[in-house]
A protein has these predicted regions:
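Periplasmic solute-binding protein
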Residues: 1-7, 45-68, 160-169
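Acidic, glycine-anchored loop motifs typical of Ca2+
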Residues: 7, 30-39
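Glycine-centered hinge/linker elements that transmit conformational signals in sensory
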Residues: 16, 20-25, 54-55, 61-102
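Short helices/loops that flank or line small-molecule/ion binding pockets
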Residues: 20-25, 103-117
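Beta->alpha turn/N-cap motifs
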Residues: 46-48, 118-124
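Extracytoplasmic/periplasmic substrate-recognition and gating elements
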Residues: 93, 131-204
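A ligand-binding cleft/hinge motif common to bilobed small-molecule-binding domains
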Residues: 121-135
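Conserved C-terminal helix/tail region of periplasmic/extracytoplasmic solute-binding proteins
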Residues: 172-179, 189-266
Length: 266
């Protein structure tokens, strides 16, 4: 590697193609002649996190039309999306990449048998939120998901599925008051709590070097909220699954999208 990932990010060269070039051929067989979780890889990923590549390309599933009404984003079925599906499929099928539908794929990274992983930030504190016996003891770096191409304006980051949502009982006699209270709490937390999470927890506890702090600023600055992911069940889960399934299976995204479109629109 001529430049480190940090340098590539700062020089606007951290693109999907560069990332793929780095990881796709790094592989060492454990000795049984078959690709498995016991081998060494350039990159590993828990399959649900494949969604991050769609977001990183600046694509959302649901947007708004000129009237402000919700509609399927044209990017969701556009050329960039179709190309991204193809690129990710090729990456997933390369020798140096291993993916599975289990979070146990993290073990490969924790055991220092993978160069890179795409995952939630909390994994640096342990295998998962309930068990820190495999806390990372080696030096690591954190960078945003790679851009689709260098002409993309910024690095984009999707939010993981664990998030909190609040609801107000439809029978409440104080819906307006409850709504105002929730809005005020959310606004205050955004201004006072969220910055502390980044400045104290992430930039200190979840960083192994000073440059990681710069990366967290880029990651936070590019956070993308896609209503199609947040309310996926409303859209038959297609807005959350179409990209990932086509990328893993190598099936035609255009065909799958055409079949799912009536369900999404309904």
């Amino acid at each position: 590697i001529e430049k480190t990932p940090y340098q590539l990010v700062k020089s606007n060269e951290w693109t999907f193609d560069k990332f793929s070039e780095i990881v796709k051929d790094i592989y060492e067989d454990a000795g049984d002649g078959a690709k498995s979780a016991d081998d060494k890889f350039g990159y590993v990923i828990y399959d649900i996190n494949i969604d991050a590549f769609q977001t990183a390309a600046g694509i959302v599933s649901i947007g708004k039309d000129e009237s402000g009404d919700l509609t399927i984003s044209p990017d969701f079925s556009g050329e960039r999306q179709i190309d991204m599906v193809s690129k990710v499929n090729q990456l997933l099928n390369s020798q140096g990449v291993y993916y599975t539908n289990s979070i146990k794929v993290r073990n490969v990274f924790f055991e220092e048998r993978a160069l890179m992983i795409t995952d939630r930030v909390f994994i640096v504190a342990g295998k998962d939120n309930r068990d820190d016996k495999n806390r990372i003891e080696f030096s690591y770096g954190i960078v945003p998901q790679p851009k689709y191409s260098a002409d993309q304006e910024s690095y984009m980051t999707n939010v993981g599925h664990p998030y909190t949502m609040y609801a107000i009982n439809a029978a409440s006699s104080k819906i307006d008051a409850c709504s105002a209270l929730l809005e005020a709490m959310g606004s205050e937390n955004y201004r006072s709590v969220t910055p502390k999470v980044f400045e104290v927890a992430m930039k200190v506890r979840y960083a192994s070097d000073s440059e990681a702090g710069e990366m967290y600023d880029l990651i936070r600055g590019g956070i993308s909220f896609d209503l199609g992911r947040l309310f996926a069940e409303t859209f038959g889960n297609h807005t959350a699954n179409l990209f990932r399934k086509a990328a893993m299976n190598g099936t035609s995204y255009t065909t799958n999208y055409s079949a799912a479109k009536p369900v999404i629109e309904s």
